[in-house]
């Protein structure tokens, strides 16, 4: 999409800038960037295009889902399908998944595991064909042990030589982040979420190599031992963080405090569509303990973001993030902090500080308009009436448009 040089003034009864509520105001954009925020009631600049959503609408940064799998179709056979489907079929489905996310107000996704780097191909195709879609922060196939969790995606690597080569390949292919299956998982036959897959030496090597290439690192960690190892190795984000042991779920307040004090991003893969079936048995049997630990992480001040695992199962379609926001508030996080987590904090987790997640001059103009006030009732996030990507209105369900003729 080409960036318009005309000034666009977006007015609404309430603004949330990614940090706090600003009250009624106006966001000014030009050439795809935010150029100003005005809450004084002043008129828009002369000859600007005005999008006036009126009272009862909140304008805020677009939502960011920090953990998705665009190549997974959210069916009961999602893992089996991704193993056998043709690349072109997968790419078309991934495009549809990205569109579904965009229409829910999700303007950035971090894809933490695809097959054969298809998320990079998708990103290129969307750009070349000017197709509106979320910004894709891509990991490519996740690193895993031979036959390990999600080995079906093609990221098997063990030992120093293979791991160095794997990180180098991701850097050369244009990945943004290196995803590592530090523990096993619940959706791969023969893999157990309470088992570690990589040792400390390998984890330090991966993080060191990723840093040399300027890449972020994300650790899939269900097992307590894997959480400890990934934290010590210096991963940028911890995914899931469910505290599994061979006997259930640990309640380790000391480790929770360590995580919180480290400043490491914690991507909670919570939230699902109601009445959509149960998660995998290993998760379902421990759900209440998992939620309790997630609540403790929030209370302890961990740097929480939301990653829905979208695509994994019928309860996790690619527009599930609003349900995850409700789940986060149910854990005890105030609505303003939950919105902060899926905007400004999430942008930082995706290495997009200053570009995404905030209403601030110089940030890219990825905005959404919500009917209602999600700061008072978080369920309002389901009521997205408009979505902007790079200053372009790409979803429009309710709008008053005019041109300013005043100075």
Task: List the predicted regions and their residue ranges.
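Metal-associated gating/positioning segment near the N- to mid-region
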Residues: 57-128, 201
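Divalent metal-dependent hydrolysis catalytic cores, especially in the metallo-beta-lactamase
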Residues: 93-119, 133-144, 175-188, 215-216, ...
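His/Asp/Glu-enriched, well-ordered alpha-helical/loop segment
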Residues: 288-373
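C-terminal cap of metal-dependent C-N hydrolases
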Residues: 13, 342, 348, 361-406
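Active-site gating/metal-coordination segments in enzymes
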Residues: 147-204
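Active-site core of metal-dependent hydrolases
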Residues: 188-292, 300-312, 332-334, 348-350
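Active-site mouth loops of central-metabolism enzymes
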Residues: 79-92, 148-165, 216-218
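N-terminal metal-binding scaffold of metallo-dependent hydrolase/deaminase domains
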Residues: 1-45, 57-59, 372-378, 392
